[in-house]
């Protein structure tokens, strides 16, 4: 009971801090009053329409308060990652629209790693018993696979990020239970999710330049998106070839879980 209470207190404190950060915006002619800033526009987007609206608002506000927008984005991203809340793909796309393709990619890779590590630590301190109680079969499966590949653990972790047998949020929660060293965990997230982050950020960068829906289906945009997808496939192909030679993988289990949702 104490671990659950402690987790709820941490969650409540972080939620309140993020609320203050999003409602105590410095005034500026671009964003009107703080009430307007703290309303519907500055909340987690749930679809592409809300995402586009939010990106337009923040891009205008960023012209006067660049540091504050950066801080707000980082806080929101770490909040989602730290508490294993699905939907970080929208924030990756938003990063591409706000910060450009390369700065956005660097930022998302770092925030994904730091946020996932925060989730690791929260699970280690408060959530081990809860995770084992609610997901005993999934934990047992991962435990068996981790032990089978202990000698090549880092590459196995990369494989799990690129070809998930289980959702990323669950891997973040269960990692301390599986005795995965935190340093290996951090760098496996940093490297393993580069292709996924790359696709999302580059897509956001492209979408932010479009002036109409028709432009989304232009040949130029289609070719750019295809090129992004091809580049992102290269690391996955290399890791998969290495895994087939050096890792102990159950192909049946992998096939059954390969379509797990890739939320971090």
Curated annotation (Swiss-Prot):
Q: Which residues form the signal peptide?
A: 1-17
Domain of life (superkingdom): Eukaryota
Q: Which Gene Ontology cellular component terms are annotated? A: membrane
Q: Which keywords are on file for this protein?
A: Glycoprotein, Membrane, Signal, Transmembrane, Transmembrane helix
Query: Which cellular compartments is it found in?
Result: Membrane
Domain comment from the record reads as follows: The VTT domain was previously called the SNARE-assoc domain. As there is no evidence that this domain associates with SNARE proteins, it was renamed as VMP1, TMEM41, and TVP38 (VTT) domain.
Q: How is this protein named in the record?
A: Transmembrane protein 41A
Please spell out the taxonomic lineage of the organism that makes this protein.
Answer: Eukaryota, Metazoa, Chordata, Craniata, Vertebrata
């Amino acid at each position: 009971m104490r671990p659950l209470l402690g987790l709820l207190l941490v969650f409540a404190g972080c939620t309140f801090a993020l609320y203050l950060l999003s409602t105590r915006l410095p005034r500026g002619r671009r964003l009107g009053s703080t009430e307007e800033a703290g309303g519907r526009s500055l909340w987690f987007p749930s679809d592409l329409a809300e995402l586009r609206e939010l990106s337009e608002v923040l891009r205008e506000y960023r012209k006067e308060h660049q540091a504050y927008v950066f801080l707000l984005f980082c806080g929101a991203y770490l909040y989602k990652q730290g508490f294993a809340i699905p939907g970080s793909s929208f924030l990756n796309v938003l990063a591409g629209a706000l910060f450009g393709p390369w700065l956005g990619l660097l930022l998302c890779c770092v925030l994904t790693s730091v946020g996932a590590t925060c989730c690791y630590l929260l699970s280690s301190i408060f959530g081990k018993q809860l995770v084992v109680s609610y997901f005993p079969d999934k934990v047992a499966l991962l435990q068996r696979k981790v032990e089978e590949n202990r000698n090549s653990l880092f590459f196995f972790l990369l494989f799990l990020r690129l070809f998930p047998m289980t959702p990323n949020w669950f891997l973040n929660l269960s990692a301390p239970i599986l005795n995965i060293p935190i340093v290996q965990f951090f760098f496996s997230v940093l490297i393993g999710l580069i292709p996924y982050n790359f696709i999302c950020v580059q897509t956001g960068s492209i979408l932010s330049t479009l002036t109409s829906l028709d432009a989304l289906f232009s040949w130029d945009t289609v070719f750019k998106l295809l090129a992004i997808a091809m580049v992102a496939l290269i690391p996955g192909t290399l890791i998969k070839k290495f895994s087939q030679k050096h890792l102990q993988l159950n192909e049946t289990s992998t096939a059954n879980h390969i379509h797990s949702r890739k939320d971090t």
